[in-house]
Design a protein with these regions (language model features):
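Short, low-complexity, Pro/Ser/Thr/Gly-rich segments in the mature regions of secreted, periplasmic
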Residues: 163-177
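Solenoidal tandem-repeat scaffolds enriched in leucines and small polar residues
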Residues: 79, 92-99, 112-116, 132
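Serine/threonine-enriched low-complexity regions in disordered or flexible coil/loop segments
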Residues: 34, 55, 76-77, 96-97, ...
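Solvent-exposed adhesion/ligand-recognition segments of exported proteins
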Residues: 5-6
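Short, small-residue-biased leader/transition segments that mark boundaries at the very start
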Residues: 1-2
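Extracellular beta-strand-rich, repetitive "passenger/adhesive" scaffolds
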Residues: 30-33, 52-54, 58, 72, ...
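Leucine-rich repeat
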Residues: 13-16
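Short "repeat-start/strand-capping" segments in structured domains, especially the N-termini
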Residues: 20-28, 40-49, 60-70, 80-90, ...
Length: 177
């Protein structure tokens, strides 16, 4: 389902509610002041969610996919209550947040540009690559290996113990909690 209103002057807002019984969802693109809320579990091979501006994306039930790709730009926010995936990719460009409350993945790539925040202490991942450019922050839970790269004042806090390879250019920090 795609709703667009480019170039239209709107003096009031319409609320769209889309209900479906499908548990399979492949891609979501939310922009503007849109909210996307999934109240049911989601399964599939791959799920990609892009959110920008002031969007709120909430996945309230378990997401179980082969690859989960979460992208935030601007000041959008995402909340995933529970996930299970082989490959997790989280990217923030701006001041948005991604909050992953519980679950596990086999490997994860976390990337923050500017001052966004990834909160993922509840998601255990054996292999993690985390890169921050700017003053963003990440709270993550690598169980075997962490490759951490910071350019700027970013902060990576991780649950340990784990093997850590780190490269910091600037005043950023990588610390075990």
């Amino acid at each position: 389902v795609l709703f667009r209103s480019k170039g239209a002057k709107v003096d009031h807002f319409t609320k769209f509610i889309v209900k479906t019984n499908s548990k399979w969802l492949k891609e979501v693109k939310a922009s503007g002041n849109a909210n996307f809320i999934a109240n049911s579990p989601l399964k599939g091979d791959e799920l990609k969610i892009n959110a920008n501006s002031n969007c709120l994306v909430q996945l309230k039930q378990k997401v179980e996919v082969g690859k989960l790709d979460l992208n935030v730009s601007g000041s959008a926010n995402m909340v995933v209550n529970e996930l299970k995936t082989d490959k997790l990719e989280c990217s923030i460009n701006g001041s948005g947040t991604i909050n992953l409350k519980a679950g596990n993945a086999e490997e994860a790539d976390y990337s923050i540009t500017t001052d966004g925040e990834i909160m993922a202490f509840g998601v255990a991942v054996p292999e993690v690559n985390c890169k921050i450019t700017g003053k963003g922050s990440a709270q993550i839970h690598p169980t075997d290996n962490l490759k951490a790269t910071i350019v700027g004042k970013g902060n990576i806090r991780y649950k340990g113990p784990t093997a850590v390879q780190q490269k910091v250019i600037g005043k950023g920090t990588v610390e075990e909690v």
